[in-house]
Amino acid sequence: MSGNTLGRLFRLTTYGESHGAGLGGVIDGCPAGIALDEAVIQRELDLRRPGGNSASTTRQEPDRVRLLSGVFEGVTTGTPIAFHVENVDQRSRDYGEIARLYRPGHADFTYDAKFGVRDYRGGGRASGRETLSRVAGGAIAQALLARHGIAVRAFTVELGGVPADLVDVAGAQLRPFFSPDPDVVEAWEDMVRTVKGEGDTLGGIVQVEATGVPAGLGEPVFDKLDAVLAYALMSVGAVKGVEVGAGFEAARMHGSDNNDPIVPSGFFTNHAGGILGGISNGETIVLRAAVKPIPSIAQEQITIDRDGKPSALFIAGRHDISAIPRIVPVLKAMTALVLADMLLMQRRMATPQP
């Protein structure tokens, strides 16, 4: 299997499966002298840890990270940064039936078609648990970005078709579902309970914002900043669509409305989402990701077995009702990883000033 590395100069390579011994990764290309310790990474991992909310699986994983290399006396050394997290609450017996059956909405069929073999325990490498390594790597990227005044935040703007108002984005991280709207939380909680009782699941929309990004990041033509960000977000298994700025709403606007007037202090509006011509323009980068419902539902489903014979399937095991809120720090991490890479590329390739 290839495709386990993201980035050119700031590179994350990940490893591990849902029910294997553990998961982890290696960051290569991080400059020396960045303040970093296990606590910095742990704070981000705790935001996506299972069992922490009403929509989450009951699987209890402490997700304690160990830094194996690349950090000395609280700062990065410029060498590869390796980290590892052990799996401790696997229950592989729940997955015995799907060794021969394909779960609708999962990667079981396509992994078999590609590799001829698959780790059926919890989805193996295709499990959402794989994103743990992304969050750990993203925490390191955020430490680098912070030195340059760049911050990334993410929050839920819609769950199960019920939107949130952007009332208090700053406080979203402290609320259930990372909601920017205190008044919508109860409705979301009620909906999760109802859908869970029906044996079903929910999707939603997550918004990611990056502030302090200087103008000039992005490498046209094929490495446009928005293209690489969309690539990174779409690499997360549950994401089925990405918008930048006004996104699909721009298709319903006139040019006179969509254009962002330029004033001495910057841009008067931000329909472009902070990116023009694939290059950051100094405004806040605004992204939205459409998150599909979790495919593991507590209902009988129609499928086939490995021999192509029709079958019925009822999925056991412990599963999220929604990828939200646990996917929120994942999307923040992916955005940070791309920005860290683009920042280093810009520093290397920038034209010297006279």
Swiss-Prot record:
Question: What are the GO cellular component annotations?
Answer: cytosol
Q: Which Pfam families match?
A: Chorismate_synt (PF01264)
Q: Which UniProt keywords apply?
A: Amino-acid biosynthesis, Aromatic amino acid biosynthesis, FAD, Flavoprotein, FMN, Lyase, NADP
Entry cofactor note text? Reduced FMN (FMNH(2)).
Q: Give GO MF terms, alphabetically.
A: chorismate synthase activity; FMN binding
**S-S bridge residues:** none
Per its UniProt record, the required cofactor names are: FMNH2
Q: Known SUPFAM superfamilies for this protein?
A: Chorismate synthase, AroC
**Which Gene3D superfamilies does UniProt cross-reference here?**
Chorismate synthase AroC
Q: Which domain of life is it from?
A: Bacteria
Pathway annotation: Metabolic intermediate biosynthesis; chorismate biosynthesis; chorismate from D-erythrose 4-phosphate and phosphoenolpyruvate: step 7/7
Catalytic activity field: 5-O-(1-carboxyvinyl)-3-phosphoshikimate = chorismate + phosphate
Q: Where are the transmembrane segments?
A: none
| One GO process term, biological-process aspect | aromatic amino acid family biosynthetic process
Query: Could you tell me the EC number(s) of this protein?
Result: 4.2.3.5
Output the CDD domains linked to this UniProt entry.
Answer: Chorismate_synthase
Residues engaged in binding FMN: R125, A126, S127, G277, K292, P293, I294, P295, S296, R318
> Which residues take part in binding NADP(+)?
R48
Q: Which family does it belong to?
A: Belongs to the chorismate synthase family.
What is its quaternary makeup?
Homotetramer.
Q: What does this protein do?
A: This reaction introduces a second double bond into the aromatic ring system.
Q: What is the name attached to this protein's record?
A: Chorismate synthase
Which organism encodes this protein? Answer: Nitratidesulfovibrio vulgaris (strain DP4) (Desulfovibrio vulgaris)
Task: Give the classification, highest ranks.
Answer: Bacteria, Pseudomonadati, Thermodesulfobacteriota, Desulfovibrionia, Desulfovibrionales
Give the gene symbol: aroC
